[in-house]
Amino acid sequence: MIIDLNADLGEGGENDEALLKLVTSANIACGFHAGDAQTMRQSVRWGIGYGVALGAHPSFPDRENFGRKAMNVPAEIVFAQMVYQLGALSAIVAAEGGTLSHVKPHGMLYNQAACEPALADAIAKAVKVVNPALRLVGLAGSELIRAGQRLGLETRQEVFADRCYLPDGTLVPRTQAGALINSDELALAQTLEMIQRQRVRAIDGSWVTVQADTVCIHGDGQHALLFARKLRSCFSEHQITVAAA
């Protein structure tokens, strides 16, 4: 059994380099919610040095709210914003001698694309135009995954170790109580359930079927490092190989 472990980096966190020793894929902020040309370049250099898969982490243009504010942006504008961000990171990766492997939207762009077909299509079309070899990472079972599949893109279905799920398979919004799992033990148990049994318990007690290609851990805070180490130990104990998807 193989699983990819990814983290969102280049967002101003202090633990980026240390996390790169534990994850197999890195999603690098492209400047719209966090980061700039220099942080993108540094993240790429670190990622190449540690041999992780390099991915773009594009967002709505929302630095004030860290990309976590819902926005009503026309599909054609989202398409242009995606091409802009992917183009910038692709150029930096090429300049450093690396290869961009995947794209994972950030924050509300990710969450809205999970439910909104037109937005999902705009993102998938931008990825295909920039580089049809790029893999599109999205919430397991989401509209974004379906949009990528319709266009013939390789997709990677993502699950979250420390987030709670609604009965429809989407994430409990961060604005609601109970959105996050604060117990490492519960987060580890949920992760194993998703990988080994392809299901997750929703907040109403029902089971939701999920495909787990890659697991996200959040890179902010010292706790992220401790949890990443626990996750790697848990995978080793259960004979789960960690490798880039």
Swiss-Prot record:
Broad EC category: hydrolase
One GO MF term: ATP binding
GO biological process terms held by the UniProt record: carbohydrate metabolic process
Keywords carried by this UniProt record: ATP-binding, Hydrolase, Nucleotide-binding
Domain of life: Bacteria
UniProt xrefs under Pfam families: LamB_YcsF
Entries under HAMAP family matching the protein: PxpA (MF_00691)
Matches recorded under PANTHER family: 5-OXOPROLINASE SUBUNIT A (PTHR30292:SF0), UNCHARACTERIZED PROTEIN YBGL-RELATED (PTHR30292)
Protein name according to UniProt: 5-oxoprolinase subunit A
